[in-house]
């Protein structure tokens, strides 16, 4: 009989831990949850609201192996993660394996190091059923909402849609932000900057840059001010010097890591969590799902030693951080390296970059303040109440800035100029006017969410927890309620007026504004579903309700509330609302909007969500003639399309001529307008009006597409037309019968020389696609 069986969540973790514990311990993995609610049923008792769990088919063999090994072990250690999900995994293991509590130990650790694992073995505890119940409450509530709301969407909006408690609120945030942007009207204003000269004590000249403390609303006011400055004198009236301290940001929580990795490394939220999971399981960092900023005394002391070794005592400052997040869970530490002495690691490029970010943030949190001298100089203008202000900063001690500087979402949108070092000045110094410039600027509207800023907003509102941010953001994109995309900028003209000498000159300049990359944009279906849920289920969509639910989960986790009581109270009001909405009659489906009538026939023109997405429809089902439909191009929105734009879609497809014996046709599909020739399609460039494309322009696009295809095509085979060697983003690959096959790198250079037999050997020996395994 084996002495000890340790069960962890993931196989990677199992391998690492087995090395630490020795021969008396066998370590196995549960690969995440071993049972769950049934997939195709509510799986919840309608009266008691008790969940009905099942072991999925793909887990039955594993469960059998775990049972067999559990029977052989004298003692069992459940070592799933120390959060609500991890506690629930351990409880399910107890239930399914029929474990005896007397010989079952629950152990937890925040890092996978030998000392942490051995310490956990020395201090086991029992299962915490309050944490289990909090997880069950979340799982059951989310199943009730999703399972009961989704059929309502199928009937009232479109088949195959789904709703979720947190995901729907996340979509609401994105839809509302988009509408704020559409409603915003930018207002112009005029900023005045000056360049002055001053003679130094040694006779040399220095420049002083300053900005007027007043901004003008009109061009006329700005020019009038420049005219006023022609004969004015400029003198220093006040100088203030102020020492500033900048303190470092605390160590990473889950959400701040996701935000900084997005800003600094360009990682998606899911990518960050996937890489962090690997770093944790390989013993490089502490547990990555946490809302705590605390550091252990060991981490603080080892950080101090490393900082002193690398930069000296003056750079070290011990700091203790305390968590202020609403409902911060359990006693986790912040995310930090397990060994601060390990400044670099082996691993993938992504692992190295994320580890470096975590290491720097942790080190900076234990470093001295940055010391800065800030000087503000006020410059009077003779004959005017307005004043110029010159700001200068000098970093006298860089402190934590030597290692790390925190980013913000506004970094890319900051229009203000950086501060400068200033020459020595005294009150009464007269400055020489060299140039004063008025620049037309425009008020900044709201900016769209990135994945990182959405995480920040969800956390700010108390919606979700560290374990839910990444899945929520992935889900709303997978379900196509939201898409990550770029917004093309627009060219804008602005005026610049400059006073130099005695002359004011005016000129126009152009700039690109409004271009955005990697922002979260609501789709038409996302907008329609959001509006339907807001109209019919306002409580579910309310930010305060969602945050209150999270607080109730916290109360359950602390043993202050019964989980099934919470479920019954919720379902008592939710179920009647679902029935009422499901049975309500309506002439139109949600999202349907009448734009007007077709002038020639008088038939109504609608825009709505069709089976395959947004469509424009002319006529109704009751008419003698069948309605006509046109897919809405991706650059048009169901909310903003006009009657004129909708009618234009029905002028397509149109034949514009002939090329090489085949018609050249301009059409429009779901992904925008296109050219069709000889059964091949070429997308029109963004912004191109399909009604104005000439035959010559279409032929040029066809030629460019052919060139691209020639570069992509390496080899074809007479033996089988379905087999090709193609050039892709990552080099040559084989395409056969609609599937792609990876080519060994050793063959890349001679891809064009491969025989039919060699290619088919690669196809026939290709590994089966791996199914996704749970953690």
Which residues make up each language-model segment?
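Basic, low-complexity terminal or inter-domain segments flanking catalytic cores
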Residues: 2-5, 16, 25, 150, ...
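Positively charged, polyanion-binding regions of nucleic-acid-associated proteins
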Residues: 231-247, 259, 435-444
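C-terminal or mid-to-C-terminal helical accessory/interaction module adjacent to the motor/catalytic core
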Residues: 112-196, 241-245
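A conserved hydrophobic secondary-structure block that centers on an alpha-helix together
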Residues: 258-260, 264-271
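Flexible beta-alpha connector loops of hexameric P-loop NTPases
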Residues: 51-56, 264, 461-462
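Short glycine-centered, acidic/aromatic-flanked micro-motifs in structured strand/loop junctions
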Residues: 80-82, 259-261, 289
């Amino acid at each position: 009989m084996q002495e000890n069986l340790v069960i962890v969540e993931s196989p990677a973790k199992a391998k690492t831990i087995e090395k630490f514990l020795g021969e008396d311990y066998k370590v196995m993995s549960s690969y995440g949850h071993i049972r769950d609610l049934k997939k195709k049923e509510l799986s919840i008792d309608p009266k008691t609201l008790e969940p009905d769990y099942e072991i999925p088919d793909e887990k039955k063999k594993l469960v059998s192996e775990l049972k067999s090994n559990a029977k052989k072990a004298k003692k069992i250690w459940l070592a799933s993660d120390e959060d609500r999900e991890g506690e629930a995994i351990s409880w399910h293991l107890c239930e399914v394996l029929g474990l005896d509590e007397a010989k079952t130990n629950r152990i937890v650790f925040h890092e996978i190091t030998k000392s942490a694992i051995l310490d956990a073995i020395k201090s086991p505890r029992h299962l915490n059923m309050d944490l289990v119940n909090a997880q069950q409450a979340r799982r059951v509530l989310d199943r009730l909402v999703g399972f009961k709301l989704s059929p309502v969407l199928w009937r009232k909006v479109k088949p195959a849609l789904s709703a979720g408690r947190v995901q729907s609120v996340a979509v609401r945030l994105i839809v509302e932000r988009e509408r704020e942007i559409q409603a915003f009207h930018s207002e112009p204003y005029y900023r005045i900057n000056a360049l002055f000269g001053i003679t130094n004590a040694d006779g040399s000249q220095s420049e002083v840059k300053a900005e007027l403390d007043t901004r003008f609303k009109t061009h006329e006011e700005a020019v009038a001010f420049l005219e006023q400055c022609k004969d004015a004198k400029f003198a220093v009236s006040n100088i203030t010097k102020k020492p500033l301290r900048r303190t470092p940001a605390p160590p990473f929580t889950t959400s701040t890591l996701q935000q900084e990795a997005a800003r600094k490394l360009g990682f998606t939220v899911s990518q960050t969590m996937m890489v962090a999971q690997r770093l944790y399981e390989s013993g490089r960092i502490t547990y990555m799902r946490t809302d705590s900023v605390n550091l252990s005394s060991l981490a603080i002391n080892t950080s101090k030693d490393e900082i002193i070794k690398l930069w000296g005592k003056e750079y070290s400052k011990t700091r203790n951080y305390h968590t202020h997040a609403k409902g911060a869970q359990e006693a986790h530490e912040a995310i930090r390296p397990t060994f601060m002495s390990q400044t670099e690691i082996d691993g993938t490029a992504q692992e190295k970059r994320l580890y470096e970010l975590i290491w720097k943030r942790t080190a900076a949190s234990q470093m001295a303040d940055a010391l800065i001298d800030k000087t503000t100089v006020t410059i009077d203008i003779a004959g005017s109440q307005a004043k110029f202000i010159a700001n200068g900063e000098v970093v006298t001690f860089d402190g934590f800035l030597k290692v790390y500087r925190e980013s913000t979402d506004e970094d890319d949108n900051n229009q203000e100029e950086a501060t400068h070092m200033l020459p020595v000045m005294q009150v009464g110094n007269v400055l020489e006017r060299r140039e004063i410039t008025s620049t037309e600027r425009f008020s900044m509207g709201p900016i769209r969410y990135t994945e990182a800023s959405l995480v920040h907003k969800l956390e700010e509102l108390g919606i979700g927890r560290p374990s839910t941010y990444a899945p929520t953001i992935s889900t709303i994109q997978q379900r196509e309620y939201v898409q990550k995309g770029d917004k093309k900028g627009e060219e804008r003209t602005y005026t610049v007026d400059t006073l130099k000498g005695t002359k004011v000159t005016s000129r126009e300049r152009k700039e690109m504004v409004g271009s955005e990359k990697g922002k979260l944009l609501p789709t038409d279906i996302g907008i329609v579903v959001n509006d339907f849920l807001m109209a019919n289920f306002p409580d579910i969509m309310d930010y305060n309700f969602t945050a209150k639910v999270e607080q109730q989960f916290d109360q359950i986790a602390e043993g202050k509330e019964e989980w099934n009581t919470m479920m019954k109270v919720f379902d008592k009001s939710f179920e009647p609302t679902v029935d009422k909405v499901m049975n309500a009659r309506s002439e139109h489906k949600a999202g349907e909007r009448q734009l007007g009538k077709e002038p020639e026939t008088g038939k109504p023109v609608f825009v709505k969500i069709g089976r395959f997405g947004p469509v424009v429809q002319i006529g109704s089902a009751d008419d003698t003639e069948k309605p006509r439909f046109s897919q809405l191009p991706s650059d048009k929105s169901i909310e903003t399309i006009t009657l004129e734009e909708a009618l234009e879609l029905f002028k397509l497809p149109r034949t514009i001529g002939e090329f090489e014996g085949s018609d050249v046709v301009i059409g429009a599909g779901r992904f925008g307008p296109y050219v069709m020739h000889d059964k091949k399609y070429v997308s029109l460039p963004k912004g191109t009006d399909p009604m104005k494309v000439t035959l010559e322009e279409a032929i040029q696009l066809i030629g460019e597409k052919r060139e691209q295809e020639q570069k992509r095509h390496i080899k074809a085979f007479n033996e089988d037309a379905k087999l090709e060697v193609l050039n892709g983003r990552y080099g040559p690959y084989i395409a056969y019968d609609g599937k792609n096959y990876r080519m060994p790198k050793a063959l890349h250079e001679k891809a064009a020389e491969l025989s039919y037999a060699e290619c088919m050997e690669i196809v026939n020996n290709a590994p089966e696609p791996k199914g996704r395994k749970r953690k």
